[in-house]
């Protein structure tokens, strides 16, 4: 099958309607700068399609034998809890080694992934790539339908009692609304987290998914706990998250389109515990610069709020704003700020603009990646990039402090 053939029912009778629905969404999920046609006809688009094809194969019977066999082939066991209640249900993937005598002697990290707004667990569990990583490197993965921080804490405590969880390595990530739910948990119970990845989000928000502001006490508690943070965004997202030195209103194409291809019959948005009911938006309000304030300086102040939570040196506003006028300085022009270690990496023919910042304690506390030509959709390799960042860290149970020590299953 040619690259573009995936995306049409005429050339892909089996799953083409699903691909066409996602393609329609792609065309409304960017800020006007993306070339979607070239994306789907590129090696990057081909890998995106391969992952989506996996999702389409299993999402309608995600607990069926075919899906279970897929997970066994990855070296994993899948279980669902509270499955009778659509919004209470959650899934855990565990390495098969956990069933062996030797494996039961070990402790296992866990990665929680928060789905996007309104999505079912099934919409993202197969296409992200966490299953292959978990089977290879031996860690657990959990997907919760209710991503509110109180439910996360409840499930985490349950897993800690029932499974051989390494409580020093609890990682949380998500995309879009799932990313803002990560941030909500990050501010409320940071001491229970090792590293986080709120992806497909702006650089900083002072309030949660329900527009509840974080309190001074919560902000100070977060700073005291220190949780390393990574963000992955698309260069062409509808909300224009990059460059970070500029602000633009979210692109409105005059219509709303969903990339969902699976809807559970039990779904009822009026009962969704993660949504605002009766508000201006289903989710939290978009930050807007105050009238009369320079939008570039406002954005750098927000960046430096993020730096402050990580004990990183603030970025110089003049230097960052100057990148608006330096297109020849590609990485800084695209990202709008600078780091301590920077690179333009290439994956599947696309540029991944990447920077790292070390904090005052010499900890690689912040990593930022923006993916060329990507709309508001989890970028290819997002899971791989997050895991590469997460696995560096553990939260020492004795001191409560973050330590850089890479996870390795076979380490004695």
Question: Which stretches of residues belong to each language-model region?
Answer:
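A domain-start/cap signature at the N-terminus of enzymes
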Residues: 1-108, 147, 173-185, 195-197, ...
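Short substrate-entry loop that stabilizes the transition state in hydrolases
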Residues: 98-108, 113-147, 205-206, 239, ...
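Alpha/beta-hydrolase active-site loop
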Residues: 145-164, 184
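Alpha/beta-hydrolase fold nucleophile elbow
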Residues: 164-176
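The feature captures the conserved acid-bearing segment of alpha/beta-hydrolase catalytic domains
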Residues: 194-195, 200-362, 375-376, 398
């Amino acid at each position: 099958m040619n690259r573009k053939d995936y995306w049409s029912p005429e050339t892909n009778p089996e799953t083409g309607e699903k691909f066409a629905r996602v393609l329609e969404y792609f065309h409304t999920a960017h800020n006007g700068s993306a070339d979607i046609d070239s994306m789907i006809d590129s090696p990057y688009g081909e890998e995106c399609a391969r992952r989506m094809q996996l999702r389409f194969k299993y999402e309608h019977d995600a607990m069926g034998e075919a899906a279970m066999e897929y997970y066994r082939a990855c070296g994993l066991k899948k279980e669902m809890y509270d499955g009778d209640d659509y919004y209470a249900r959650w899934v855990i993937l565990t390495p098969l080694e956990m069933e062996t005598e030797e494996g039961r002697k070990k402790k296992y990290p866990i990665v929680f992934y928060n789905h996007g707004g309104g999505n079912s667990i099934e919409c993202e569990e197969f296409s992200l790539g966490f299953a292959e990583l978990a089977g290879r490197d031996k860690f657990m993965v959990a997907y919760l339908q209710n991503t509110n921080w109180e439910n996360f804490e409840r499930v985490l405590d349950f897993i800690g009692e029932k499974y051989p969880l390494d409580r020093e390595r609890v990682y949380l990530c998500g995309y879009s609304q799932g990313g803002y739910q990560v941030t909500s948990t990050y501010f409320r119970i940071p001491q229970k987290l090792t590293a986080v990845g709120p992806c497909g989000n702006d650089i900083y928000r002072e309030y949660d998914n329900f527009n509840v502001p974080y309190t001074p006490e919560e902000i100070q508690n977060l700073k005291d706990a220190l949780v390393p943070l990574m963000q992955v965004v698309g260069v062409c997202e509808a909300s224009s998250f990059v460059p970070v030195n500029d602000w633009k209103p979210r692109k409105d194409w005059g219509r709303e389109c969903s990339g969902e291809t699976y809807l559970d019959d039990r779904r009822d948005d009026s009962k969704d515990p993660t949504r605002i009911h009766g508000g201006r938006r289903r989710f939290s309000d978009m930050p807007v610069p105050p009238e009369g304030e320079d939008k570039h300086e406002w954005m750098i102040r927000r960046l430096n709020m993020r730096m402050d939570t990580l004990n990183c040196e603030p970025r110089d506003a003049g230097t960052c704003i100057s990148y608006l006028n330096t297109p020849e300085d590609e990485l800084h022009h695209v990202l709008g700020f600078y780091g301590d270690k920077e690179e333009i990496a290439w994956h599947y023919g696309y540029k991944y603009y990447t920077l790292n910042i070390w904090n005052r304690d010499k900890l690689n506390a912040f990593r930022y990646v923006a993916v060329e030509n990507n709309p508001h959709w989890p970028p290819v390799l997002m899971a791989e990039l997050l895991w590469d960042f997460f696995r560096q860290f553990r939260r020492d149970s004795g001191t409560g402090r973050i330590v850089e020590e890479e996870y390795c299953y076979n380490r004695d």
